[in-house]
């Protein structure tokens, strides 16, 4: 078992509490097989609402697949209690937003996409955030100012 943390870095403008919303949020990852080094050719996703049985009766995981090259079964489990928001106080710094229990694979890339929420820094106005382009902007009517999330980047660390 290897625990991997996904860290996010972004510049938040007049918003805070950027988070993956709900148990149906899809974490899109590229994965590398630790047995043979094969990297997935397409994005794979996992979410808390979906789980699959792990071969050999070892419980369930949020993502289970067989490596196309070496045919080894690998799995990833989202650590539910490790999901945290990215706050305005983290602005411009890497911060761990989720941890994965990886067996046989390790993530190499993350695609943020849709399903994020944030709130106005001074107004708590809720916003639905789409990070497909790694930038998002809107207008907070209550505060009468622009809001946005810019320059989203990510990295993985071993925990």
From Swiss-Prot:
Keywords per UniProt: Metal-binding, Zinc
Annotated S-S bridges: none
Highest taxon of source: Eukaryota
Chain positions recorded as Zn(2+) binding sites: 33, 36, 67, 70
One annotated GO molecular function: zinc ion binding
InterPro entries: CXXC_Zn-binding_euk (IPR008584)
UniProt cross-references to SUPFAM superfamilies, sorted A to Z: MAL13P1.257-like
Family stated for the protein in its record: Belongs to the UPF0587 family.
PANTHER family the UniProt entry points to: CXXC MOTIF CONTAINING ZINC BINDING PROTEIN (PTHR12857:SF0)
Domain notes: Requires a bound zinc ion for normal folding and solubility.
Protein name: UPF0587 protein v1g245604
Species for this entry: Nematostella vectensis
């Amino acid at each position: 078992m290897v625990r991997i943390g996904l860290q996010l870095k972004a510049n938040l403008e007049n918003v805070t509490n950027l988070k993956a919303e709900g148990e149906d949020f899809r974490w899109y990852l590229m994965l590398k097989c630790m047995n043979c080094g094969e990297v997935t050719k397409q994005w794979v996703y996992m979410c808390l609402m979906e789980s699959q049985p792990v071969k050999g009766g070892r419980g369930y995981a949020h993502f289970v697949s067989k490596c196309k090259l070496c045919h080894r079964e690998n799995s990833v489990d989202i650590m539910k209690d490790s999901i945290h928001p990215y706050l305005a106080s983290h602005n411009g710094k890497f911060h761990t937003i989720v941890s994965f229990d990886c067996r046989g694979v390790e993530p190499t890339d993350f695609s943020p996409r849709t399903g994020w929420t944030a709130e106005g820094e001074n107004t708590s106005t809720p916003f639905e955030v789409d990070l497909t382009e790694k930038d998002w902007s809107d207008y907070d009517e209550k505060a009468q100012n622009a809001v946005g999330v810019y320059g989203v980047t990510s990295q993985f660390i071993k925990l």
